[in-house]
Amino acid sequence: INFEYRFGVLLFCLQLISCATNSVYSPLLRAEPEIGSELTRAPRTLRLYFDELPDVSQSSLRLVGPNGEHQLRGLHTMSENDLMIEIIDPVTRGEYRVEWVTAVGADPGVYSGTFNFSVPAEGN
């Protein structure tokens, strides 16, 4: 069997393995604003709920909107398996992406993900 055939089979197997591992566990249960929601008013905070208490020291949240990254402050937990942070600058109409990173419970793994929400024009 030639080298190209073996190499092709190897690449195919690696691709199958990567597909099988793409359905990875995520500790995120829900969020405020809701994942994929269209809001009637601009949020002043972000709050993400996990299946176990997140480690704040190993966590970060980012909010990216139509005008770039928003300033956030005061990442903390309310002891409800959550992370909460204040949005400093005004959230205007448009599409937003929340990027999160955290470690939860006794699990040594660090997890990450993104979700979107939108703020429509007034009157919509």
Where are these regions (language model features)?
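Acidic, low-complexity Ser/Thr/Gly/Pro-rich repeat segments typical of extracellular/periplasmic
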Residues: 25-28, 37-41, 45-124
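Short, solvent-exposed loop/edge segments of extracellular or virion-exposed proteins
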Residues: 31-33
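Bacterial N-terminal signal peptides that target proteins for export
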Residues: 1-9
